[in-house]
Design a protein with these regions (language model features):
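Helix-loop-beta substructure at the N-terminus of cytosolic sensory domains
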Residues: 359-408
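Bacterial carbohydrate/catabolite-sensing allosteric modules
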Residues: 6-354
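Conserved long alpha-helical elements within nucleotide-processing catalytic cores of c-di-GMP signaling
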Residues: 525-548, 555-585, 591-595, 599-600, ...
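A short, aliphatic-rich beta-strand micro-motif
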Residues: 451-460
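Amphipathic HAMP/coiled-coil signal-transducing linker helices
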Residues: 355-356, 505-526, 538
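Catalytic core regions of nucleotide second-messenger enzymes
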Residues: 303-308, 591-592, 621-637, 670-673
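Amphipathic alpha-helical "output/dimerization" segments
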Residues: 476-496, 502-510
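Catalytic-core segments of nucleotide cyclases and related cyclic-nucleotide turnover enzymes
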Residues: 331, 566, 611-618, 626-629, ...
Length: 673
């Protein structure tokens, strides 16, 4: 290698070493800032009546989210089979609020919504939007299906009743007659009893529609059966089991001595009951963990299972006659420790709800409402905590004539929704934060380091929605012994009353205005004078201003009517009123005091203002005459009086004096022509 080339290579090598060394130094002194990882957003569509299962799912999901990678937005409805269609529509509209493409994955509790069709529709919407979606309990093609194994746990339960308790005669209380999970649970029990030579006749199958009311009637019917109670009543969920047990106890029966009652779902209320329910656990905690891990794998590009079976298992309690050895006594003692404090919390929340209902209901102005809510929550928000927001479409309250269907459509179409009250994560209470379908939580920060759960509930009147409520999933009001749904419902009732108050005020103001206005001229009539003149008079006395009272009267009005007809006479009155209105100061009033007499009242500093006004009115009258559009010549007479400092005359005396001065002017004009 020549000397020249060696020098070139040496220089290049030196340069590379220099850059490498200095780059390391620069990185050490000025380290590159870490880019904060944005959390993923998960939307969950749930029915509020399945809150216990949802909470178990969320508990499992969050326990698996060890790196706080996810924020969860739960969209709640309380639609049900036995509600009015309009109410259900208003509840279900919450599912239309989010833009699904704004979320990284969806979880639809398809088996516990108001209908199977609702769940399937939501899942298909997500698939069409290209968003990964879990369908819980109902299999939908294209979704990640988490199917609950209703069979294994129910088989265990049925065998336990036969083999341990020798149950022969059974009544089954199903959910909705056409619901697939209700059908599966009933068929499983019947199959097991059939296999053991103890068939269950069709007349022993009842349907409580998953709730209390029909189940209470079924319990009464069973108690009145001449054949007596069956050996066991198997309910297809814990709520119906609890309702049945409660009614039978009220009727004087002792459980489980007189009859065994079992459930399905393993909800906390059943485990706090006496006797503790024997039931089946569908393990929603595991479902939550599976959802979290599957989403993480999918977002990381890993292959995932599209069909996952979640096993159910028998949970033996006391209601079947087992566990009479005090196994659950310690749990009851722990629950007993909080019984009174829980009751105090409920009482306190009831008081808070009453105060809020009155605060909202007795308000008839939107601006006043926002101020009252901010003031209220600034002083007390122990139950709702931070990250609590009431978001509304303001037009619903500010435009009382707004069509309610248009209100809902505009709100969904990125209309001007805003928070009427917001409690931020820092305890600050604000109002007026704008939101949209893409940014539903005021102040939401996707980059913070903690994971959050938000509950969103619809606000609606019948089928028309005007907003929603956001509650932090960890707020005190979400605890089992408090009724979050009732809290939101009271908001809806209070807002409905409040909007009615605004409407009534608008109509009353409109009627009052109509009653105070002269229809021919648009000026105040005598009733308007009674309501408006005295406040001006009182204000002048209070402020030390001088009161001006002026009369204006049309000259030769009788001649205009006689010669040119009453139509032209009416025109003369309207023209004079127009001349007065055109030049009237905002803080004065003008009254059609008689047929062709006009009264003007207002505060002035001196008589120059009155003279200027009179001159302007006369100029306007001359302009009408100059235009030549009317067959008559319009002229007016006027007179005014200005109060003097220290005057204490009543308003009627000033009006009488001004009227006399006007007639003096009128006499003079008539005598000159």
């Amino acid at each position: 290698m020549c000397k020249y080339c060696k020098e070139r290579v040496s220089k290049v090598f030196f340069y590379i070493c220099y850059v490498f060394i200095h780059r390391s130094v620069i990185k050490a002194v000025y380290p590159r800032p870490k880019v904060r990882k944005m959390k993923k957003k998960i939307a969950v569509f749930a029915n509020g009546y399945g809150l216990d299962s949802l909470k178990a799912l969320l508990k499992g999901f969050r326990s698996a989210d060890v790196n706080n990678e996810y924020d969860i937005f739960v969209f709640f409805s309380y639609a049900s089979y036995d509600e009015f269609d309009e109410f259900n529509r208003g509840e279900l509209n919450i599912y239309d609020l989010p833009d699904l493409k704004d979320y990284d994955a969806l979880i639809v509790l398809s088996n516990s919504l108001n209908s199977i069709e609702t769940g399937i529709t939501l899942v298909k919407r997500a698939i069409e939007a290209g968003v990964p979606v879990f369908s819980i309990g109902i299999e939908v093609e294209g979704a990640i299906n988490l199917i609950l194994d209703n069979v294994s746990g129910m088989k265990e339960l049925a065998k336990h009743l036969i083999e341990v308790h020798d149950v022969k005669r059974v009544a089954i209380i199903g959910g909705y007659k056409t619901h697939p999970e209700s059908i599966c649970r009933i068929d499983t029990v019947r199959q097991v009893f059939e296999e053991h030579g103890r068939p269950i006749p069709e007349e022993n199958i009842y349907y409580g529609d998953w709730g209390n009311l029909k189940t209470l009637e079924i319990a009464k019917h069973l108690a009145e059966d001449p054949a007596g109670l069956p050996d066991a009543i198997i309910a297809c969920n814990d709520i119906m089991a609890l309702a049945c047990s409660t009614e039978l106890t009220r009727l004087g029966y002792t459980l489980p001595d007189d009859v065994i009652v079992t459930g399905f779902d393993y909800v906390p209320k059943g485990q706090a009951f006496y006797p503790v329910l024997t039931t089946v656990d569908t393990d929603f905690t595991t479902i939550g963990k599976v959802c979290c891990n599957t989403i993480t794998d999918h977002l990381n590009g890993k292959a995932i299972e599209m069909h996952i079976l979640i096993n159910s298992k028998l949970m033996v309690g006391e209601s079947c006659g087992c566990c009479r050895d005090g196994l659950f006594d310690e749990r009851r003692r722990e629950q007993g420790k909080t019984t009174y404090s829980d009751a105090l919390d409920r009482e306190s929340l009831d008081g808070s709800e009453r105060a809020l209902t009155q605060l909202i209901s007795y308000t008839d102005e939107y601006g006043e409402l926002t101020k009252k809510l901010v003031d209220y929550y600034s002083g007390e928000h122990d139950f709702v905590g931070n990250d609590f927001h009431i978001v509304i479409y303001g037009k619903y309250f500010t435009d009382v004539m707004a069509d309610e269907q248009e209100v809902f459509e505009d709100a969904l179409d990125d209309g001007p929704m805003q928070s009427i009250v917001s409690i931020g994560s820092n305890d600050e209470v604000t109002t007026g934060t704008p939101v949209s379908r893409h940014d539903l939580i005021p102040g939401y920060n996707r980059a913070d380091t903690e994971s959050h759960v938000y509950f969103l509930f619809p606000l609606h009147t019948g089928l028309y929605n005007y907003g929603y409520v956001v509650v932090n999933g960890d707020a005190r009001i979400t605890r089992e012994y408090l009724d979050l749904h009732a809290y939101v419902e009271k908001f809806m009732l209070a807002f409905r009353i409040q909007r009615s108050n605004i409407q009534l005020k608008f109509y009353n103001d409109s009627l009052r205005k109509i009653s105070e206005i002269d229809t021919m001229t648009g000026l105040y009539n005598r009733l308007g004078y009674e309501n408006k003149a005295t406040p001006i008079y009182d204000n002048c006395k209070r402020s030390g201003s001088r009161l001006m009272v002026m009369f204006i009267d049309i000259n030769r009005m009788k001649r205009i009517n006689d010669v040119f007809g009453h139509i032209n006479g009416d025109a003369a009155i309207r023209l004079t009123a127009s001349a007065i209105k055109t030049n009237l100061r905002e803080d004065w009033i003008a009254v059609r005091f008689g047929g062709d007499e006009f009264l003007i009242i207002g505060g002035v500093k001196n008589k120059d203002a009155a003279e200027a006004f009179r001159s302007d009115v006369l100029a306007s009258v001359d302009r009408f005459n100059h235009e030549g559009a009317w067959p008559f010549r319009l002229s007016v007479s006027s007179g005014f009086i200005i109060s003097e400092e220290g005057d204490d005359k009543p308003l009627t005396e000033y009006i009488k004096d001004a009227d006399n001065l006007m007639y003096e002017t009128k006499k003079k004009m008539h005598s000159e022509k």
